[in-house]
C-alpha cells in the first residue's frame, strides 16, 4: 500500500507515523478553460520542541504518494491544535495567484511574457517560446482579493493570446499553446454510473468585442477630501495625465494613485474606449443562439479575428 509523504521545508510528515488525516484536491480542467486551484490540508503530530516554528507562510510543500511526486504547493496556514498536534493548509501556485492583487494597466504592445511575469510576481513561470514575444494591447483592471485577483488578469492574458496554463511537479507555472491531441482515455472502469451529460442548445454564431483605448481630453475628478500619507485611490476606469492639488501623487498607474497626506483634489483625463463586434457564423441551420465574449479587454484590433476563430473552434 502506497504511503503518503508530505515535505514541509526540511520536515517530513510520513504516513501512519505522524500523519493522522488529510485531504488533497488535485484538479485539472479537461478543456483548460478554467485556472483550477489545488489544495492540501492535513492533521499531524510532531515530536519537535513546542517552541519550534514548523513552517512559515509561503514555504514550499511537496506531496508524494508512494515514490511518486504528485504536486508542489505552498503553506497558506499552519495552526497548533494541541500539545503536539498541528493542522496544515497548503495551496498551489494558481491558488496563490487568487490571493494576490494586480494593479492592471493600459498595454500598448508589451510582450505577453513581460505581462505574465508581472502578474505572477514571485511565482516562477515559463512562457513557451512561440508565445513569449506576442504583443498585447488593451486594458486590465485593478484586481484585489477577495472580489478579484491576479488570477483573473492572468486568465485575460491567456484568453487574448490563445494559451493555457499547466503546472510542473516542481510548482513552476507553464504557459503554452493548446494541444489538439488526446490527453488521456477514460475507460468504462473509471466512469460514474450516476453521471449525466447535458445536451446544450447548439450555437449558431459566436462574437467577441474588440476594444480600443486612446488617450482622451475629458477630465474627471477622482478624489476630493483629506488623505493620509500613502492612501490608495482606485479608479473605476483607466485614467492618464493625473493632476493633484493639496497633496502629491507618490505612485500611480492607469487604475490607481497613491497620494501623500493633505487636503485637496485629484483629477485625471479619461481614455476613449471604442468597441467593435466581431461575429462569426458557426451553423446556419439551427435556431439563433449566439455565444459572445464582451469583457475581454485585451482583445484588440491586432488579435480580434484570431480570438473569434479560436472561439468558433471551441464551440
Residue ranges and their predicted role:
Residues 1-25:
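Polar/acidic, low-complexity leader/linker segments enriched in S/T/G and N/D
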Residues 26, 33-34, 38, 96-101, ...:
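N-terminal export/assembly leaders
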Residues 195-315:
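Charged, gly/pro-rich, cysteine-poor intrinsically disordered low-complexity regions
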